[in-house]
From Swiss-Prot:
Source organism of this protein record: Acanthamoeba polyphaga mimivirus (APMV)
Lineage: Viruses, Varidnaviria, Bamfordvirae, Nucleocytoviricota, Megaviricetes
Name of the featured protein: Uncharacterized protein R47
């Protein structure tokens, strides 16, 4: 280790980052060789080069300072982003966004489960764990859910339920047409075309 270069690096790092990091694990070889740095905030030990740590934005702790596209998010922006993609499945009204590494509360509209999740994880994989643990619905359970949503608008006597990804056949009680529709979309409110313009239906 070049002691003078290490002291110079340490002085610059403390001047830039103040007390964010602990440099006790640093074995300084040169400006472009990775060193280990301890984050005092989350206790994560990460690797970066001295040059990157001093002069580039990706030289900080990746857990506390994630990629720039997430840094600009606010509570309003992240809710808007999620509602555009997954508005049918989740309730985001309890989100208080402080960063992608701080948990937020989200509610599943299907099973009413409230759960805590890191925003960055939910953005990558927007799923309710409680729903994921449940077994596939039986035909009876599916029809019961459909009736709760649609009431008596459809006749489910011909249904052969094989899973949410599969199509089902139902009869519209308004026009009498036999419909072939995706099971999941039907639970999300998909209607017969004859009912689309009927606000009271």
């Amino acid at each position: 280790m070049d002691l003078l270069e290490f002291v110079d690096f340490l002085a610059k790092a403390l001047n830039i980052h103040e007390s964010k990091y602990d440099y006790q694990h640093v074995i300084y070889i040169d400006d472009e060789t990775n060193v280990k740095i301890l984050c005092n905030g989350c206790k994560n030990i990460f690797k970066t080069t001295p040059h990157t740590h001093l002069y580039l934005k990706n030289g900080e702790c990746s857990k506390c300072f994630p990629c720039r596209k997430y840094k600009k998010l606010t509570t309003e922006k992240i809710i808007s982003k999620l509602e555009k993609k997954y508005s049918d499945d989740f309730d985001y009204s309890e989100i208080d966004y402080r960063g992608v590494n701080y948990p937020v509360i989200i509610s599943c509209k299907k099973c009413k489960n409230r759960f805590s999740v890191l925003p960055k994880e939910f953005l990558r994989n927007p799923k309710c764990r409680a729903c994921g643990r449940k077994k596939n619905l039986s035909s009876r359970e599916y029809v019961e859910r459909a009736v709760l949503i649609h009431g008596s608008k459809y006749d489910y006597s011909k249904i052969e339920y094989r899973g949410l990804k599969c199509d089902i056949e139902i009869i519209c009680n308004n026009c009498g047409i036999l419909l072939k529709i995706n099971a999941r979309n039907h639970l999300r409110g998909r209607k017969c075309g004859c009912l689309l313009g009927n606000k009271t239906s």
